[in-house]
Amino acid sequence: MTCTLEKVLADAKSLVERLRDHDSAAEILIEQTTLLNKRVEAMKQYQEEIEVLNQVARHRPRSTLVMGIQQENRQIRELQQENKELHTSLEEHQSALELIMSKYREQVFRLLMASKKEDPTIVTQLREQHTNEMQAHIEKINEMATVMRKAIEVDEGRLCEDEERIKRLELENSGLRELLGISREAFLLLKRDDTSDSTSLSPLLTSTDISLRKS
């Protein structure tokens, strides 16, 4: 009985150590989430600056506008990839926590069964000792999950706005290209008409000049 009780206590201690390791991983995820939030804020500021620059975009070369759109697309893809990786890490961490919780409950049950005929205070002390630690870990995980969900919601909202802005810019760019093509065609047509008129008037001007000289 004593051997079994010691084994159960050792297993419980091992589970607590694993919980501490996962708690460290949770803190790392929280730091990454905080960093992502800062990047989202930086992206928001960047978009505000882009909005100001778009007001004078028509006075700049088309290549500058295209480069700005390409840079914005690249940043959006990077944020989407980082958001996806953080979301995957959160799911993996929660799955690991659920597995550890299941193992912990199993160990506590075995301890209860092994200590059924022993002093009940041992069971009570062990349960109180680990319940507090487990509750602290659960609260940290819930806090991390809340922060992650908020970051994901903010990120998705910003991405939707960015996609709409990009579509508007692409539509405007297409319209500018079309207007540029029309202007070029009109210029070439007028140039061709001027050349034709000059050619047809040349003999008439020459004849008139000769008549005036004879007079």
UniProtKB/Swiss-Prot annotation:
Record bears the keyword Coiled coil: yes
Coarse class of the protein's main subcellular location: cytoplasm
Coiled coil: 35-183
Any GO BP: response to wounding
Family: Belongs to the SIKE family.
Keywords: Coiled coil, Cytoplasm
Protein name: FGFR1 oncogene partner 2 homolog
Disulfide bond entries: none
Subcellular localization, as worded in the UniProt entry: Cytoplasm
InterPro entries recorded: SIKE
GO cellular component: cytoplasm
Organism: Danio rerio
One Pfam assignment: SIKE
